[in-house]
């Protein structure tokens, strides 16, 4: 990483021994080791995360391409089938149905005529009940015994 050779490392150790002294050198070496270890872990985490993101992006791109290819094939197939069906449409449908439908003509809003002073509007008709059919159906108010329910 830094390309430090043995000679450079030995020179750094001697300078540290002279500056820090023999009492503080082990503590400083441990702290330096922790810093270097933390830096290595951060670099490895960063590179692994970067690799994961690149792989995920490549996978997304492949999925996009695969999805586009699949949709294009389906679209071509459907368009081909529709074009072929239009060729034979005149054989299946009568002549008046093969033409494209025209839009409906615009209609005016029709208001019902207002009843004149002498005329009364008819009340709505109620359905007429057949009394014979009504008598066949039991009413809720008729007394029934518990044995009737199970027979």
UniProtKB/Swiss-Prot annotation:
MF GO annotations: protein transmembrane transporter activity
Membrane topology, as annotated: Single-pass membrane protein
Location(s) in or outside the cell: Cell inner membrane
Chain positions covered by the region annotation Disordered: 87-151
Biased composition (Low complexity): 134-151
Alphabetized Pfam families for the sequence: TatA_B_E
Predominant location category: membrane
Keywords: Cell inner membrane, Cell membrane, Membrane, Protein transport, Translocation, Transmembrane, Transmembrane helix, Transport
Residues annotated as transmembrane: 1-21
GO cellular component: TAT protein transport complex
Basic and acidic residues: compositionally biased ranges: 87-99, 122-132
InterPro entries per the UniProt record, alphabetical: TatA/B/E, TatB
Gene3D superfamilies xrefs: 1.20.5.3310
GO biological process: protein transport by the Tat complex
Physiological role: Part of the twin-arginine translocation (Tat) system that transports large folded proteins containing a characteristic twin-arginine motif in their signal peptide across membranes. Together with TatC, TatB is part of a receptor directly interacting with Tat signal peptides. TatB may form an oligomeric binding site that transiently accommodates folded Tat precursor proteins before their translocation.
Quaternary state and interactors: The Tat system comprises two distinct complexes: a TatABC complex, containing multiple copies of TatA, TatB and TatC subunits, and a separate TatA complex, containing only TatA subunits. Substrates initially bind to the TatABC complex, which probably triggers association of the separate TatA complex to form the active translocon.
PANTHER family reported for this sequence: SEC-INDEPENDENT PROTEIN TRANSLOCASE PROTEIN TATA, CHLOROPLASTIC (PTHR33162:SF1)
Record-stated family: Belongs to the TatB family.
Protein known as: Sec-independent protein translocase protein TatB
Gene: tatB
